[in-house]
């Protein structure tokens, strides 16, 4: 019981996201009535009580906690008690299932924009499943101290594998139903076939956090440990027997595997005692003086990680009585509205004084500027907004106007673009009524672009604009937030460009740098350059097309030696910083010219004389009577602004 209550997955979630632990702790109590020799409706009723106690805290975790009981019922072919139990579960859960179904019809499709099945299942191999380190979060972040140590430290790898080995041994002495449950659990957690993963990103998206099904593995394994320990006595003298020695070793394993709990490592990073008083003062002021408008919490942050503690959710959330908005990792609003928030963030970052004009569309008349984020912020930021500034410690409150519902006296201006375009147009030309359309627009913008988005970060989340056949580097089903606007994308001419990687990739370490994409190598501007992604020290870039006796023009951003390849022929070339060099490509006519780097550097110029290869962001022609074009690089700073339209 102790090993189950303090299993690795529990230690990984407790105190950080305890809602995922609560239903799991009740799973054994659901099973218990179904272990009687003869099952009746009373057993089904008894098994329903712990399901009722799981509450509505996490629907998927509730289903997962009931799955071990379902396995036992199916194994025993106890269909009548099983049906009675299912009806009981539905009855005690109807109070939250009903609203969940109704709200699900109106909720934005946020599961498309969070962790994908490729992320949640990446570390679910057999050893990790048996050890119990099934939660994916500790593998990508050190925030959950206990979970991170259990997942990565060799000591815990050994002791958790030791417990798993004891459990497998003991399991061989138990009834077969427990072995069946273990096999089912391994199959559910460890299946890596494509159709299964695709289903977890599609109709089964609610179940993609498979670690919630850990009880299918943990219950039978720990029953096996209990069975093994029952026949392993502890030493009673200084000369223990073999069994007593094994018993002592097993006890030590049990103590060691739960050591994160008794060594005070349960709390995650950023634990805090209370929210500072200045947050209470600031929110009280807003509740009094900005009650008839919406408040923007600025700047954006994936999660609320302050210098005084990591609340994860916004510290103002339980304190504000007024409408408020923030750009965080998972805004629970429609995708177009998220794009609109991104446009507001870009406008405020570019020029706060004019960017505030984009707030009126969202009904925002007050801004909370926080200076206590872990990343650090400009203390003078609030003064750049204009408006009436009130200071409360590390939080500034700016009262702009009491913006509410906006009414336009004329028909809206039709805009071909994404939600972000509305905010940018407001910032530059002033707010007015505008409508997003996909054709016959009065204003044509270069948004949205075909891009990859790393939904897991707000620090350089968007790649450079891409061509239709460029590979995606993100695992989500949707490359970016969908939009009503026509898609601007890179069109290639004279051939194509392929690269080993790019610092402009959405998944590049440290965030995407759109000015370092493959397009930058062939844009005719020496101020921009393609760079391989950080960590790609042997990168390459390749021109593909039909080249006759090609002469290559090449320029690097630093002194380096590159290898120019064409088929089986190759030549090494020494380059000086920002000095163009012409090279006769070995091998004659070719369909591919590759430049291999000897170390990570930028390629500012790459082209074949008289046979240019181009990549240009092209705005689709959907509006023959357009009155105005609006192009920008605030959302994706590509270094230069080149558009074909």
Describe the predicted segments one by one.
Residues 245-327, 421, 428-436:
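Extracytoplasmic
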Residues 1-75, 82-100, 250-261, 295:
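Membrane-embedded helix bundles of polyisoprenyl
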Residues 35-45, 74-81, 172-173, 218-248:
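Membrane-interface junctions at the ends of membrane-embedded or membrane-associated helices
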Residues 290-358, 447-526, 629-644:
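Extracytoplasmic/lumenal acceptor-recognition loop(s) of multi-pass membrane glycoenzymes
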Residues 1-17, 92-108, 121-140, 168-211, ...:
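Membrane-interface helix-loop junctions at the exits of transmembrane helices
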Residues 525, 541, 546-559, 595:
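A short beta-strand element within beta-rich, extracytoplasmic domains
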Residues 10-21, 113-121, 144-155, 183-224, ...:
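Membrane-helix boundary/interfacial segments in multi-pass membrane proteins
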Residues 88-170, 210, 432-486, 493, ...:
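Periplasmic/ER-lumenal interhelical loops and adjacent helix-loop junctions
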């Amino acid at each position: 019981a102790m090993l189950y209550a303090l299993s690795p997955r529990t230690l990984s979630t407790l105190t950080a996201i305890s809602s995922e632990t609560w239903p799991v702790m009740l799973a054994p109590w659901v099973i218990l009535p179904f272990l009687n020799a003869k099952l009746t409706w009373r057993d089904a009723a008894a098994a329903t009580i712990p399901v009722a106690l799981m509450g509505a805290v996490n629907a998927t975790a509730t289903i997962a906690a009931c799955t071990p009981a379902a396995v036992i019922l199916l194994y025993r072919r106890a269909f009548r008690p099983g049906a009675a139990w299912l009806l009981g579960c539905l009855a005690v859960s109807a109070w939250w299932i009903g609203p969940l179904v109704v709200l699900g019809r109106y909720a934005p499709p946020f599961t498309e924009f969070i962790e994908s099945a490729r992320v949640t299942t990446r570390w679910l191999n057999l050893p990790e499943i048996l050890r119990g380190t099934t939660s994916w979060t500790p593998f990508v972040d050190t925030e959950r101290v206990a979970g991170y140590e259990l997942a990565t430290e060799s000591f815990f790898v050994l002791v958790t594998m030791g417990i798993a080995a004891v459990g497998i041994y003991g399991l061989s002495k138990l009834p077969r139903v427990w072995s069946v449950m273990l096999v089912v659990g391994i199959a559910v957690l460890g299946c890596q076939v494509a159709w299964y993963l695709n289903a977890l990103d599609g109709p089964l998206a609610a179940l993609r956090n498979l670690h919630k099904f850990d009880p299918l593995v943990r219950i039978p394994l720990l029953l096996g440990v209990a069975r093994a320990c029952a026949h392993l006595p502890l030493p009673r003298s200084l000369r223990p027997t073999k069994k007593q020695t094994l018993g002592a070793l097993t006890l030590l394993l049990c103590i060691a595997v739960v050591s994160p709990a008794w060594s005070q490592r349960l709390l995650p990073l950023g634990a805090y005692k209370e929210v500072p008083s200045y947050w209470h003062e600031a929110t009280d002021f807003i509740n009094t003086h900005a009650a008839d408008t919406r408040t923007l919490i600025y700047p954006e942050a994936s999660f609320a990680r302050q210098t005084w503690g990591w609340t994860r959710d916004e510290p103002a959330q339980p304190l504000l009585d007024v409408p408020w908005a923030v750009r965080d990792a998972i805004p629970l609003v429609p995708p177009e509205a998220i794009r609109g928030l991104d446009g507001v963030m870009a406008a405020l970052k570019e020029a706060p004084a004019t960017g505030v004009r984009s707030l009126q569309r969202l009904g925002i008349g007050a801004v909370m500027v926080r200076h206590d984020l872990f990343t650090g912020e400009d203390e003078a930021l609030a003064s750049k907004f204009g408006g009436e500034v009130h200071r409360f410690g590390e939080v500034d409150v700016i009262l702009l106007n009491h913006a509410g519902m906006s009414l336009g006296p004329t028909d809206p201006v039709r805009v071909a673009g994404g939600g972000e375009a509305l905010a940018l147009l407001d910032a530059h030309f002033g707010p007015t009524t505008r409508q997003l359309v996909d054709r016959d627009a009065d204003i044509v913008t270069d948004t949205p672009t075909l891009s990859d988005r790393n939904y897991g970060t707000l620090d350089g989340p968007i790649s450079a604009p891409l061509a239709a056949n460029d590979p995606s580097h993100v695992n989500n089903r949707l490359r970016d937030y969908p939009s009503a606007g026509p898609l601007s994308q890179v069109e290639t001419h004279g051939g194509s460009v392929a690269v080993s990687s790019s610092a402009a990739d959405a998944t590049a370490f440290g965030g995407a740098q759109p000015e370092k994409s493959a397009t930058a190598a062939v844009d005719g501007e020496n101020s921009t350059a393609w760079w391989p992604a950080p960590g790609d020290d042997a990168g390459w870039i390749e021109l593909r097309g039909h080249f006759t006796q090609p002469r290559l023009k090449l320029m690097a951003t630093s002194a380096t030696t590159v290898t120019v390849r064409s088929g089986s022929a190759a030549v090494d070339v020494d380059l000086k910083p920002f000095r163009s060099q012409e090279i006769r490509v070995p091998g004659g006519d070719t369909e591919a010219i590759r430049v291999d780097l000897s170390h990570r550097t930028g390629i500012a110029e790459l082209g074949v004389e008289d046979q240019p290869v181009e990549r240009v962001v092209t705005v689709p022609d959907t509006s023959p009577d357009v009155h105005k074009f609006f192009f920008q690089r605030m959302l994706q700073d590509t270094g230069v602004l080149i558009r074909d339209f």
